[in-house]
Amino acid sequence: MAKRTKKVGIVGKYGTRYGASLRKMAKKLEVAQHSRYTCSFCGKEAMKRKATGIWNCAKCHKVVAGGAYVYGTVTAATVRSTIRRLRDLKE
């Protein structure tokens, strides 16, 4: 593992390359993709990224398609709320 500092965190592996602002953007993405998320099926904080857009729960072993870097996306939330609203209108 590459040595990281307190200030730069996970992007310390890039050293002085690519510029500070690009490293800040990369840090935001990398922290999001490596963190654990709450599983929508079992409620445990065990959802981890397996590959690009594929999320796996370590507890209930559900595999879900999600965002590339985060479990849930803004578009998915919009679609979910639209479907819920249309279902309520139908009833």
From Swiss-Prot:
Alphabetized SUPFAM superfamilies for the sequence: Zn-binding ribosomal proteins (SSF57829)
Zinc finger (C4-type): 39-60
Gene Ontology CC, one term: cytosolic large ribosomal subunit
Domain of life of the native organism: Eukaryota
Keywords of this entry: Metal-binding, Ribonucleoprotein, Ribosomal protein, Zinc, Zinc-finger
GO biological process: translation
Family designation: Belongs to the eukaryotic ribosomal protein eL43 family.
Protein name: Large ribosomal subunit protein eL43
Gene: rpl-37A
